[in-house]
């Protein structure tokens, strides 16, 4: 029997938004499909294994700086973390779908946005609660 994994708040953006990171495929599923709401923003490294990153928002609006910081977290927690830049896809969670019978952590999405992010998270405020 698998133990249920809890979603982990990893950071708080410079603008005060909570950022959550799934640290394995089961946490990614829990975070994306049980914890996040439709207007929250979902981030993931493009075409490579990595963590799902969720930014909680009430109305779907985020400042540019929070998009950039969440992108950096997605880059850091991906297979591309040793590269100088990683392409990150992001989209509102309501557009992220799980195909029937798919393995934990596997998703599909369309009409996403992309940004290039440095995997440097040294200046992000880590949650230590």
Give the residues covered by each predicted segment.
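Phosphate-backbone binding interfaces of nucleic-acid-interacting proteins
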Residues: 12-20, 27-129
């Amino acid at each position: 029997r698998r133990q249920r994994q809890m979603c982990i708040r990893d950071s708080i953006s410079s603008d005060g938004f909570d950022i959550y990171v799934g640290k394995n495929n089961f946490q990614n599923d829990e975070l994306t499909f049980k914890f996040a709401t439709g207007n929250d923003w979902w981030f993931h490294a493009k075409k490579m294994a990595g963590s799902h990153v969720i930014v909680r928002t009430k109305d779907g609006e985020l400042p540019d700086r929070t998009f950039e910081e969440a992108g950096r977290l997605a880059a850091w927690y991906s297979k591309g973390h040793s590269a100088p830049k990683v392409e990150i896809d992001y989209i509102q969670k309501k557009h992220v779908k799980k195909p029937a019978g798919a393995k934990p952590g596997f998703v599909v999405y369309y009409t996403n946005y992309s940004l290039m992010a440095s995997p440097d998270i040294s200046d992000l405020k880590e949650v230590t609660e």
